[in-house]
């Protein structure tokens, strides 16, 4: 009975070590170039809420959702 438990734990340990090495090889870091960054930004560019500027809001006429989304 003790030998079966020892074999089982050895097998589990071996599988965990093997699996951990496989995961590290598959998660390679990528170097994002400028073209890739443009693709990731999408059609509308960066998405941020600008500082509150009354001149910007009054000239644009977009006081609702567009100002929030941009």
Curated annotation (Swiss-Prot):
Its main location: secreted. It holds the Pfam family Spexin. Residues 1-22 form the signal peptide. InterPro entries: Spexin. Keywords: Hormone, Secreted, Signal. It comes from Danio rerio (Zebrafish). Belongs to the spexin family. GO terms for cellular component: extracellular region. This is Spexin prohormone 2. The lineage of its organism: Eukaryota, Metazoa, Chordata, Craniata, Vertebrata. It is found in: Secreted. The gene is spx2. Residues 23-30, 45-70 form a propeptide. One of its GO terms (molecular function) is neuropeptide hormone activity. It comes from the Eukaryota.
């Amino acid at each position: 009975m003790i030998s079966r438990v020892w074999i089982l734990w050895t097998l589990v340990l071996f599988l965990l070590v093997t699996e951990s090495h496989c995961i590290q090889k598959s998660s390679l870091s990528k170097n994002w170039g400028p073209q890739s960054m443009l693709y990731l930004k999408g059609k509308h560019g960066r998405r941020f809420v600008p500082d509150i500027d009354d001149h910007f809001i009054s000239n644009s006429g977009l006081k609702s959702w567009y100002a929030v989304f941009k």
